[in-house]
Amino acid sequence: YGQIVGSIIENGRADRFIVRLCELIKHLAVDKLHIVGDLFDRGPRPDIILDLLMRHHNVDIQWGNHDVVWMGAAAGSPICICTVLKTTLAYHNHGMLEDCYGINLRHLQRMAEQFYGNDDLSIWMPHTDAARGPYTRGMLHRCAVMHKAISILMFKLECHVIDRNPDFQMQAVSYTHLTL
C-alpha cells in the first residue's frame, strides 16, 4: 500500500484522493438518511437541500407541515400559495421565490402598494436575519406591504374554506378583530 499512496502523492492527486476517501467513508457510515421535515420554510435555498438529498444513495423523507403546504402551492392550491407567500414575506425570504423558482412578485407588490402603501405597517414588518442583511427601510416597507396584502387574501380564502366546511367546527374563527 505504500507504493500506491506514494504514486498518488507523486501524481499530485493526494487532495482529490482524500476527498473521495472521506466521501466513501461518509457513504458507508450512513446506511439510510432519515429526514424529518421541514425542508421548506425559512431557509434561503431549499432547492439546494433537495438536490443534495437526492444524491444520497438511500434517503427517506417524512414531510413536515411546511413541506406539505409547499406541495399544495406547487399543485396550484390558492390558500397554500398564499400561505407560502405569507411565510416567506414574514421572514423576508421572498427573494428565494424570485431567484430560485422564477416567481415574479411585482404584481403583488404593485397591488399592495396601491391599497396599503400608506398604512401603518408596523405589525407586518418582517423578521430579519442580521447575517443576511443589511436591510434598507425601502426593502422592509416593500416586504411589509406585500405581507399585509397576501395575509388579507389568505384570511379571506380561509373564511371561504371554513364556511364551506362546517364539519371543521371552526365557525368561531373570525378575522373581524383585525384592523386591515
Language-model features: locations:
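Residue-level marker for buried hydrophobic side chains located in beta-strands
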Residues: 33-35, 61-62
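Divalent metal-coordination and catalytic microenvironments
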Residues: 38, 65
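Metal-dependent catalytic neighborhoods of phosphoester/phosphodiester hydrolases
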Residues: 44-51, 72-78
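Extended charged low-complexity segments that act as oligomerization/scaffolding linkers
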Residues: 73-124
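Short gly/pro/ser/thr-enriched loop/turn and capping motifs at secondary-structure boundaries
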Residues: 67-70
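Low-complexity, highly charged intrinsically disordered N-terminal segments
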Residues: 1-22
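A short alpha/beta connector and helix-capping loop motif
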Residues: 48-61
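Conserved small/polar residues in nucleotide/adenosyl-binding loops
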Residues: 176-179
